[in-house]
């Protein structure tokens, strides 16, 4: 079984954690932006499935 040769330093651990959190923050920001554009109706790059009941009511 593979085991690390030496303990990972706190600096390296914190650096990796900051990278992961930064990537998560970017993904969350992008998701919020897409969600806002979808809700406001300004989204141009999405295709929505339209059910038959919605067409009958409109």
Curated annotation (Swiss-Prot):
Keyword Ribosomal protein attributed: yes
Keywords associated with the record: Ribonucleoprotein, Ribosomal protein
GO BP terms in the entry: translation
Keyword set includes Ribosomal protein: yes
Signal sequence, start to end: none
Classification via InterPro entries: Ribosomal_bL32 (IPR002677), Ribosomal_bL32_plant/cyanobact (IPR044958), Ribosomal_zn-bd (IPR011332)
Biased composition (Basic residues): 1-15
Region (Disordered): 1-23
Single GO MF descriptor: structural constituent of ribosome
GO CC term (a single one): large ribosomal subunit
Family stated for the protein in its record: Belongs to the bacterial ribosomal protein bL32 family.
Protein name: Large ribosomal subunit protein bL32
Source taxonomy: Bacteria, Bacillati, Cyanobacteriota, Cyanophyceae, Synechococcales
């Amino acid at each position: 079984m593979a085991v690390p040769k030496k303990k990972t330093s706190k600096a390296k651990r914190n650096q990796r954690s900051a990278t992961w959190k930064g990537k998560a923050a970017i993904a969350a920001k992008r998701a919020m932006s897409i969600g806002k554009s979808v809700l406001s109706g300004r989204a141009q790059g999405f295709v929505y499935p339209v059910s038959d009941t919605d067409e009958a009511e409109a």
